[in-house]
Amino acid sequence: MPQMKYEKHNARQYEQILRAARQLFVEKGIERVSFSAVADSCGIARATLYKYFPDKESLLWAIHRQALRTFGNALLARAEARPLTALERFSVYFEELARRFELDPDFLLFFDLFEKTYQAETARRGSAVYERMFRPGDFGSGDTARFICENFNDGSLRAGLDAQLTAVSATYT
């Protein structure tokens, strides 16, 4: 029983760190936020923060992974409810993006701040950074485009479009 209580505390602490760090990154910019500032914002010692994250980069990726997982799960849940045409997949993508922004405006602000790092480090699914930051089963880099590409040539979109180019253009611009 005490072990379960400790695990719940760790999970709550982890979530608190992610929320506080993301808020700081959005308010001040990634470069201007130190590990000490994150610890202070959470009311914890720096050593405690290091228990959860070995460095700032790992913390940034954890925030990103959590946000992407939340967004990806919402997309997949809507697609599992019933089969979607390619046009409906585009609609679902943009509806979920708008919904996420409405529920959590910092969601897109963090992605905007993190975009340069994200694109550089995840351009290839098999890269060392990608493998370290995304766990098997995570909604990761490129999965949004793959979501849109499914059923792409079902006739609901103009014929002759390149599926990958169209999906990437829609999701990353």
Language-model features, listed with the residues they occupy:
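Short hydrophobic/aromatic patch on the recognition helix
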Residues: 21, 42-53
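Hydrophobic/aromatic-rich alpha-helical bundle segments in the mid-to-C-terminal region
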Residues: 108, 112, 152-173
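Amphipathic alpha-helical segments used for helix-helix packing
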Residues: 100-128
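Hydrophobic/aromatic residues within well-ordered alpha-helical segments
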Residues: 13, 56, 63, 67, ...
